[in-house]
Design a protein with these regions (language model features):
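Inter-heme linker and motif-flanking segments adjacent to c-type heme-binding CXXCH motifs
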Residues: 44, 117-120
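Bacterial N-terminal signal peptides that target proteins for export
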Residues: 1-5, 95
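The canonical Cys-X-X-Cys-His
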Residues: 31-42, 94, 110, 114
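Sec-dependent N-terminal signal peptides
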Residues: 4-13
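Electrostatic cytochrome c docking/interface patches
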Residues: 15-32, 41, 45-47
Length: 120
């Protein structure tokens, strides 16, 4: 009986850990929904105004003057701490993102997606 209980606990805990592993795939989906409208590589076609520059990408292009990519998905220097801090607390013109908009688990997924190219 004890072995069965122990086995169930191990299997249950393993499933819990797997469910908590950040997902780059889900991170891309969350990024596309919440971040790409300002920080994407390509501006979506706007019926009223045509194709325009993205506010976040344009601001970063001016700030970095070609020294770093303006498109967040191309960056290799973004750390998990930096991403989480900017998302939750904002920076310059970027507003905060509440946990009711992007949960901590979703933010972890975005971090996994944006840090996939992190310099080792």
């Amino acid at each position: 009986m004890r072995r069965i209980v122990l086995l169930l606990l191990v299997v249950g805990f393993g499933n819990y850990l797997l469910a908590q592993t950040p997902s780059e795939t889900n991170g891309k989906a969350v990024f596309d929904k919440w971040c790409a409208p300002c920080h994407g590589a390509v501006a979506p076609k706007n019926v009223m105004f045509g194709n325009g520059a993205l506010a976040g990408t344009s601001a970063l292009a001016v700030k970095y003057k070609g020294k770093l990519p303006a498109v967040l998905e191309q960056r290799t220097d973004l750390t998990p701490v930096m991403i989480k801090s900017v998302v939750r607390h904002g920076l310059y013109g970027m507003p905060i993102t509440r946990k009711t908009e992007v949960s901590d688990a979703e933010l972890d997924d975005v971090v996994a997606y944006l840090t996939r190219n992190l310099k080792k």
